[in-house]
A protein has these predicted regions:
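Membrane-embedded helix-loop-helix hairpins and adjacent transmembrane boundary segments
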Residues: 2-577
């Protein structure tokens, strides 16, 4: 009888109570792990002591990688963009293959703490190191802006607090375990966060797939017939709903082939150049473990990425059927809750009391933010309250795990690459650790500002970070590993040209700087969107690097010998600091 009463009580608990319970449990777990695994040395702080197993590192890498963009925003983009959203899937997944095959083992062989550390030593120049630090900070701050917006989204809706308060709570949590634990604390915390986020993403997907198609496997349900409409496939139904409202067919793309190619390439090579992902491969003992870690991470990432298109289609179908042409007075409770956050807005333009959701902007009365689709999906499908709260806990795990990794990159770039290697080479290990933690505190404050004043929806902000990584780091790393003739003059010039052109394009065509109004798509260079321009900047980086290299002296022989050695990825280089 006691058990039955407990079950009934659990069913009757509101979403907010469930959210407090699940978020409270998971946050306690993260903080407990951070205290247990806190860093005692700079090696612990930067690379977790360099002795993490491939399985643990693979799980931590997957959590580090699957940010708020993957958990919250990717399915939201696919939900609204349909086939066009597939570029994010292709780019981000393909990037991991590139990273595992081309970069991870060689970077581990080189044996450094950070990407700017590799740049500085490979190109025998503190100027190159400084440019690397600036690029790492630009990439990381752009990326972390998306994570803090994700944190604010979840808190503002599910804990029903002000979005600014939500960001502050997230800042305090991530500050505690990132600053105290360093890479060692973050690694084990991220293993727990991966388990939370993948469970939170898959449970509602399985529920809704079974509810809509009778098939509990979302990847199969995505291509199945609807349970309540025999002989009608889910995607056919969604195509029909979309065209009825004046949108393009869900399964048809509208982006130009050039833009699709550019975005996919920018995301792929941007993945391979992300400082917070690369640094994870410095935490394992051996070169072969770096490749194993990448393989394990890729498998764990694919679980979520192969489910995202199904979640997007389920959410889009349910949203249209629930809201389109329905009286505003009878909208479900979840709609009103999201409306208070400002992420759903309804304006009754023709005063008929019905929600007109159509492609024509002049007639459309409903605006839905891309980023709420995954979070609202269980509510739209009327799943149990504990499932809705579980998604909130998963979204926070995704955002905070990546934010922690990014904050570590920022603090390491400042304390290790800037202070230790350039400003004060004689600094003690104790003072370097203090500098790293102070840098993380400052970085959290700046990240919080970006969370309160976000530059765009989560996945777009993150895609811009990938563009910056593609434009700056990827050519310098690839040429540094595979071309021993590559010298400091070429690398420095290439990185500067790449990052400056990408920044200019991003500021002009994404944020509207340099113009009174945001330029239209017709003004994009070669028809390439800001999210895809990283591929153009990357090519410019390669061209400038190789051209300048041809006109300047070759690197010292000892540097060329190091390049020869790291191309044989056996054993492991000793991490130096």
């Amino acid at each position: 009888m006691v058990m039955i009463n407990s079950i009934l009580l659990a069913k009757s608990l509101p979403v907010q109570t469930w959210t407090y319970i699940l978020v409270g449990i998971t946050f306690t777990l993260y903080i407990g792990i951070a205290i247990w695994a806190r860093a005692g040395s700079t090696k612990d702080f930067y690379v977790a002591g360099g002795g993490v197993s491939p399985l643990i590192n693979g799980m931590a890498t997957a959590a580090d990688w699957m940010s708020a963009a993957s958990f919250i925003s990717m399915a939201g983009i696919i939900s609204f963009a349909g086939y066009d959203g597939a570029v994010y899937l292709m780019g981000w997944t393909g990037g991991y293959v590139l990273l595992a095959l081309l970069l991870a083992p060689y970077l581990r062989k080189f044996g450094k703490f950070t990407v700017p550390d590799f740049i500085g030593d490979r190109y025998y120049s503190n100027t190159a190191r400084l440019v690397g630090v600036i690029c790492a900070l630009l990439v990381s701050f752009t990326y972390v802006a998306g994570q803090m917006r994700g944190v604010g989204l979840v808190f503002s809706r599910f804990l029903e607090v002000d979005i600014n308060t939500g960001v502050l709570i997230g800042m305090l949590i991530v500050l505690f375990y990132a600053v105290l634990g360093g890479m060692k604390g973050i690694t084990y915390t991220q293993v727990a966060q991966y388990c939370v986020l993948i469970f939170a993403f898959m449970v509602p997907a399985i529920f809704i797939s079974f509810q809509m198609t009778g098939n509990p496997i979302p990847q199969l349900g995505f291509g199945s017939e609807l349970a309540e409409e025999s002989n009608t496939f889910l995607l056919d139904k969604l195509d029909g709903l979309s065209t009825d409202l004046g949108f393009a067919e869900y399964t048809e793309g509208t982006k130009s082939l050039v833009d699709v190619f550019a975005i996919t390439m920018a995301l792929m090579v941007g993945t391979a150049g992300l400082p917070h992902v690369i640094v994870r491969f410095f935490t394992v003992k051996h070169v072969k473990d770096a490749r194993k870690s990448a393989g394990i991470a890729l498998f764990l990432i694919v679980i979520l990425y192969s489910t995202a298109p199904a979640v997007a289609a389920f959410a889009r179908t349910n949203m249209i059927e629930t809201l389109s042409n329905q009286p505003y007075t009878t909208v479900p409770q979840w709609f009103k809750k999201w409306e208070t956050t400002g992420l759903i807005t309804f304006v009754d333009k023709n005063n008929d009391g019905l929600i007109q959701y159509v492609a024509d902007k002049n007639k459309n009365e409903l605006v839905v933010d891309n980023d709420i689709m995954v979070l609202a999906n269980p509510e739209i499908a009327e799943l149990p309250n504990w499932v809705i709260a579980l998604v909130a806990a998963g979204a926070l795990a995704a955002a905070l795990s990546t934010a922690a990794g990014l904050l570590l990159v920022i603090s390491a770039s400042v304390s290790h690459d800037l202070i230790k290697k350039i400003v004060n080479p004689k600094i003690s290990e104790k003072n370097e650790l203090v500098a790293a933690r102070l840098s993380a505190v400052v970085a959290v404050c700046i990240a919080g500002y970006f969370g309160i004043n976000p530059p765009g929806f989560v996945a777009a902000t993150v895609a811009l970070a990938f563009g910056l990584a593609a434009a700056s780091f990827f050519p310098a790393i690839i040429l540094g590993i595979f071309y021993k003739r590559m010298n400091k003059e070429g690398a420095i010039a290439g990185m500067i040209v790449g990052i400056v052109t990408m920044l200019y394009y991003m500021l002009k065509y994404k944020l509207g700087w340099f113009d009174d109004v945001l330029p239209s798509k017709s003004e994009w260079w070669f028809g390439i969107s800001p999210e895809g321009f990283g591929s153009v900047s990357m090519l410019l980086n390669f061209i400038v690097s190789i051209t300048i290299m041809k006109l300047t002296p070759a690197p010292p022989q000892e540097v060329q010998d190091i390049v020869e050695r790291i191309r044989i990825p056996n054993g492991a280089g000793e991490a130096t600091h």
